[in-house]
Amino acid sequence: MRPPRVSALLLDLDGTLVDSEPLHRAGFEAWFAARGWSYDDDVAGLFTGRRADDVFRTVDGPWRDGDPQVMLEEIVRLVPRDWLVEPLPGAAETIESARRAGIPLALVTSADTTWAAKALAPLGGLEVFDTSVTRDDVDIGKPDPACYALACERLGADAGAAVACEDAPNGVRAAVGAGVGTVLGVTTSFVAERLREAGATRTIPDLLTLPALLTG
């Protein structure tokens, strides 16, 4: 069922619009392995959808004595400079549908602006969004709701009538915390149960069904 009078569509990037989570995971796995630390699914879940330096700073782990910013930079350097990512199913159609319907569109991501711009190149770049909120725009990342609150503020949109799409529990919590009325959990990275436990209104396998939900 289409959410009535959608005030804005708020889209996460990694794992929602583009298939970049394997690229992120490879960098983390290499960095952890070099230190003899395990990077299993439970550890990966701490980082997915969050800024790595926030995790290093606030979550206890074998990294506790390191500098969060330095550790983040070390991981980033392990990602190949010539990386490319592919749009996930339904990403292009969702953006096109929202723009055609006149629904204000925002990117809300834990990535920095440089990463976001490159990752979005196959979809038309940051320019396809009415606004974008990246890690460069907020002091604290997801699951803190500041990023979603800022996106709604910039768009002049009622959060309660907005729709957000997120692939990770941390992102779902951020959107719910900002009062976003409809939070769709996209099961590209986590099972539906995990996303519902985080507060997702409903779950979908990918964005292919979203244009129909938005336009009725």
Residue ranges and their predicted role:
Residues 87, 108, 140:
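Residue-level marker of regulatory loop/turn positions in helix-turn-helix DNA-binding domains and
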Residues 30, 42-43, 59, 70-71, ...:
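Residue-level detector of alpha-helical recognition elements and their boundaries
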Residues 2-96, 100-101:
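N-terminal helical cap/lid subdomain that shapes the substrate entry/recognition surface
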Residues 16, 109-111:
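Conserved phosphate-coupling serine/threonine residues in phosphotransfer and NTP-handling enzymes
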Residues 104-106, 182:
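Proline-centered loop/turn at the N-terminus of a beta-strand
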Residues 1-7, 92, 96-99, 112-216:
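Asp-based, Mg2+/Mn2+-dependent phosphohydrolase catalytic module
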